[in-house]
Structures are given as structure tokens and as C-alpha cells.
Amino acid sequence: MKAVRVHAVGGPEVLRLEEVDRPAPGPGQVLVQIAAAGVNFVDVYQRNGLYPVERPFTLGQEAAGTVTGIGPGVREVKVGDRVAYAGVLGAYAEFATVPADRLVPLPNEVSPKQGAALMLQGMTAQYLACTTYPLKPGDTCLVHAAAGGVGLLLCQIAKLRGARVIGTVSTAAKAELARAAGADEVILYTERDFEEEVRRLTGGAGVQVVYDSVGKTTFAKGLNCLAPRGMMVLFGQASGPVGAFDPLVLMQKGSLFLTRPAVLTYIATRVELLARAGEVLGWVRDGRLRVRIGGEFPLAQAADAHRELEARRTTGKLLLIP
């Protein structure tokens, strides 16, 4: 089978499409024929060495497809089931072995492409809006990269929970996408200072929560956008990691809260995994949440998908199609 492998850390050019043996499922494992795999910043961080992984390895932590084989002791699924998963390396391939307890059943109304697009980013948007800072009517949130994969989903979920949404984007075209996803106000950060705009839009009060996946270039100004006792949720670092930080600043700016969450912590148990994935997939099934596929690439063009993602030229979700 074909798989995208990493032998040395570096830029997108280190990604190599290789012929490898098809894996066999061991005890508690399932063999999944991949229909679509999601492309995420965590893949970039593992490729460039920011998140160390023993090499060589097959990239990718999110996919959807069909069960084609099961190992001893598997009770959760059977051959022929449509499934999706996240948090298991090896998705940039034609087949992958996955622990059965990490699989999520796909409703008939949800396509494999939608399933692959929703696992990491959909569950991320869900835990951000429902658990990390549970949005409620009367809250105002600031969503950076509001036209990105997580951003578009987060805007929609925030509106489902009754919050006011202020989004930041880089272009007018992305602003339209964010508005279509429910953003009440959209700031073009390339033309206006987002901190000043947030203060203006909130009458100087600030927002209850900032959802920041950008990191280095937005973090400090984002703290200034928060109301007293507001929460900075730093869940990514697309522009680079945030530098050394003195917690005393949180007190000085109004007894602020700061968290650096990761989706795998929020789906550590099968109960949580099924609950979060089930809610997200249910919203899609019922037409309450829309998934935007921003681009599809064959495995041989995985490097191009990474270049698009890193250049922030994407809107919605990028997929690899084996």
C-alpha cells in the first residue's frame, strides 16, 4: 500500500510517498481502508520537529473509511462498518490499523469526507465552546482565524449556544465565509488593529473569551481584548509559539485566566470521545452544522497541502484522498 512517510524533520519537501506493507490488526485493533484523511497543523508540527515523533513514521492523525479487518478481542465494530477516528498516527495512507476503542461510527447521513473533516477540528470546536469556556447567551467571544477549519465550526457552535461572535480574518473573501458561519462582526486584521476594533465593538468592555489558534502574533494583543476575569484559550500556534510569559500579567490585566488545551485530553476516555463526536456528527446530520471542505489532494501531493495550510491560504478543511 502507499503511505506518506517522514524520515527527517524539515519542510514539506521531506514528505515521501512510499510503498509499504499493509499492516495487520493486532489484539484490540481494526484495519481501516482510508477514504479521506484530514490535514492539520499537528501534522506540520510533527513533520518539522516541533512535536517530536520517532522516525520514520507515517503522518496523519485523522481519517474516515471502512473497516476491512478486525483483530482478536474486538467487539466495538465489524467488517464493513463506516468509521472515523482521530489521535492515532498513520492516516496519510491507503490503510491504517487503529485501536477499536478509538473508532467512532459514522451516521449514514454523514459522508467519509465530512467525517474526516470533523474528527479533530469538529471535536476541537465542540470542547472549546462547550467545556473549556462554556459559552452562554450574553457572552461575546473573539475567534481568530474565523474562516479556517476550526474557526468556521467554532463560529457556528458559538451561535448555537447563543453567544455573540467577533471573528478575525485576513481577506474580504474570508470575511464573507465567517459571516456565513454566523460571525456577528468580522475584523480584517490586515487592515485594522483587531485590539482597537474589539474594544470599539464591545464599548470598551472586552470579550469573555478569546479563542486563539494563531499564537505568537496575536497572543499579547488578545489578552488586551479580554474583560476582567476573561479567559484566553490558546489552542494553536500557527504563527509560532508564544514566548516566555510572566503570569503576573494575568493579574495586572484583570485577573485573567489562561489555558493551553489539546483535543486528545478532552477525548481521553471512550465515553468522552463518543459524547463529543456524537454531538458534532449529530449537528451535521440534523443540518445545524455545516462542514466546508477547503481542498482535496491525492497522497502524492501531501506536501502541497502542507504548503497551503502553512501559508494560511486555506478556508475550511484540507483532505488527502488515497
Enumerate the predicted regions with their spans.
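C-terminal capping/lid region of NAD(P)-dependent oxidoreductase domains
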Residues: 286-295, 303-322
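Hydrophobic/small residue at the entry helix of a nucleotide-binding pocket
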Residues: 150
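Glycine-rich phosphate-binding loop and adjacent beta-alpha segment
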Residues: 169, 217-288, 321-322
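Glycine-rich beta-strand-centered segment in the early N-terminal region that forms part
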Residues: 21-38, 48-90
